[in-house]
Design a protein with these regions (language model features):
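Glycosyltransferase catalytic domains, chiefly GT-A lineage
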Residues: 1-353
Length: 353
């Protein structure tokens, strides 16, 4: 039986991306799992773009910030950072990779994610890749492996599938060869043009094969260890149905995808409590308000631009169109200007006093 301190929870930031997501993750993790090791990995090329407020928060919560060497994927494959992070050395006996858009839902025994001789995973929600199932035959043939007879139930569609797992939560023994085999398998598949549409799903395609090739078996965990909160908010009746299902699940590891999906679930109050304990913000909504405002403005600008682009415009409409076009260009430029993006953040987010 492992102690909480025998586990390392690790994740990736990619400035300016995933910074506020990581605030939610480390706040909820430290709130519920006070003795676990927390490690944030950042590409070394982005070292100078880790903002001071985040370094300060990490220090206050005993989060170890480490830097990743360049990945071997060409062209760049951002999901490859998780595999590269998995390959790094960590002292605790068990490593658990978490996508950064995750919150810890409650205190629980991490041994539930650490079955000896296994890699802990949760099935993907839907057929993001692998439909038709015959696509897997070519992948397994690359490694002279038979397609397994085993089937898993996809967590959202409830359809049966050849083992296909969400790579947002992966638990494995730190001293095993699994991570290196994951990298080797992913690189091999990435270089095979016969495997169509392999990106961005490469990490998940390689995952079940890497488990087997490393001499491990998959510990197929229940959905509560990677509970997706995403839903179609434009269809309230369907969203309400999904929330009922989410609320009925014992969500220990909450894969919220976007903070807006936290709202309206039974997990919101607890996540907000963790955030308010370690930061000056009362919850996820306040923490991410500026991001939401920028997203709302962009949506409005794009709507105006698209509605006027192809029509015969009046003088007044032409003024609106030119203003929207200019603002659209400014928004697009700001998205790729890392320095400008980081300047929006406060100097500190720690609680005052």
């Amino acid at each position: 039986m492992l102690r909480q301190s025998d586990f390392s929870l690790f994740f990736v930031i990619d400035p300016p991306a995933l910074l506020l997501d990581s605030v939610i993750l480390v706040s909820t993790a430290r709130y519920h799992l006070p003795d676990v090791e927390l490690v944030a990995y950042c590409p070394d090329a982005k070292r100078e773009f880790v903002p001071a407020f985040l370094k300060e928060l990490y220090s206050s919560l005993n989060v170890d910030l480490r830097f990743l060497p360049p990945a071997s994927f060409s062209p760049h494959y951002k999901q490859g950072n998780k595999i590269l992070a998995a390959c790094q050395s960590r002292k605790p006996a068990q490593s658990i990779f978490l996508d950064t858009d995750i919150a810890i839902g409650r205190n629980f025994d991490l041994n539930d994610m650490a079955k000896p001789g296994h890699v802990g995973v949760v099935p993907e929600g839907i057929f993001t890749w692998g439909k038709p199932q015959s696509l897997w035959s070519r992948v397994y043939a690359m490694f002279d492996m038979d397609v397994p007879d085993e089937r898993v139930t996809l967590s959202r569609s409830n359809l049966q599938s050849i083992p296909y797992f969400n790579a947002g939560v992966v638990s494995f023994p730190s001293n095993s060869s699994f991570a290196e085999m994951w990298m080797e398998t992913a690189n091999a598949i990435d270089g095979n043009d016969e495997i169509r549409h392999r990106r961005p799903w490469l990490d998940q395609i390689a995952l079940p094969l890497a488990i087997t090739r490393s001499g491990k078996s998959a510990h197929v965990m229940e959905p509560g260890f990677n509970l997706s909160l995403s839903r179609n908010l434009d269809k309230p009746h369907l969203a309400a149905r999904d929330v009922l299902k989410m609320n009925a699940t014992d969500g220990r590891v909450i894969h919220y995808h976007d903070p807006v999906y936290i709202e309206g679930t039974r997990y919101a109050a607890d996540i907000d409590k963790a955030i308010s304990t370690f930061t000056k913000y009362p919850g996820a909504a306040a923490l991410t308000q500026q991001t939401r405002d920028r997203r709302a403005e962009a949506a409005r600008v794009w709507r105006v631009f698209e509605s006027l682009k192809k029509k015969k415009r009046t003088e007044e409409e032409d003024v609106l169109f030119r203003e929207a076009r200019q603002r659209k260009s400014e928004i697009k430029a700001s998205r790729i200007n890392t320095v400008a993006g980081l300047s929006r953040y406060p100097a500190t987010i720690l609680p005052s006093g």
